[in-house]
Amino acid sequence: MTSTAKQKSVQNEEDLISEIKERCKKANAIILAHYYQAPEIQEIADFIGDSLDLSRKAANNDADIIIFCGVHFMAETAKILSPNKTVLLPDIDAGCSLADDCPSDKFQKFREENPDHYVVSYINCTAEVKAQSDLICTSSNAVSLIKKIPEDKKIIFAPDQNLGRWVQKNSGRDLKLWPGSCIVHESFSEEALLKLKYQNPGSKVIAHPECSQNLLILSDFIGSTSKLLDFVSKDTSKTYMVLTEPGIIHQMKKKEPNKNFIEVPDVEGCKCNECPYMKLNTLDKILDCLKNNSPSIELDPEIIRRAYVPIKRMLDMSN
């Protein structure tokens, strides 16, 4: 791209951002963005966070419209917590492989086969699965919430089996796991990670607990996106191999500009291990959804009513 073309592109983006901000102000709209969104979306968001932080913000804001820059289950959660608000998802096809791994009809059958179990569902699931759950959790609070469940209760944990195994190990509780997983966190290369560790002596490996066990045992710190951010801010190392969606690195570099953050390649050797769904949202689509007041999240009122209970229970137990 020539320097003239670059200048034009920057100017077009500046104009786009300016119009988005102006329309948000007029519509009393708030932009919520997950850490896995593209840097330019993170920069215009009114609030950036992990699933737990975003849930809290969705439940407590004065906006009339929530523009959720994340994926479908996140926007659904915002609608459940703020049913009287308009919730817009810039790209309605921004789904989640993990949520897709747990269809509500099959999950209902799984529950019926285990009727004496307390159902804990990771927030990365559909509204219909949330409505069948006793408690929702995030990767930030899963261990602490599981520890609060009476020991005489048997527990189902769904839909992420990798997170479930990590929670099981750290909580000391036996969990009946649903066999789901995230395409991003499943595809990191152990061989590439070992090579990077050898090439970067003194570095540390930080991982999201959705990663598979063979990667977690090689990690120096495991935690949710917000906890990974906290760790790199407090830790004294200078270089980190990052085993989660690379969108988080934008915030890591902002917090610690003098530290190095290395994306771990996937099994095909590509340093492009991005969530294809998260990256469907763009500035253009944000502007379009503001102009058209769509795509909006619509849920059955009964699903909202039932799904609200385990989400609210999570928020209350997390305080």
Question: In which residue ranges do the predicted regions lie?
Answer:
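Active-site loop-to-helix "anion-binding N-cap" substructures in soluble metabolic enzymes
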Residues: 1-242, 249, 253-319
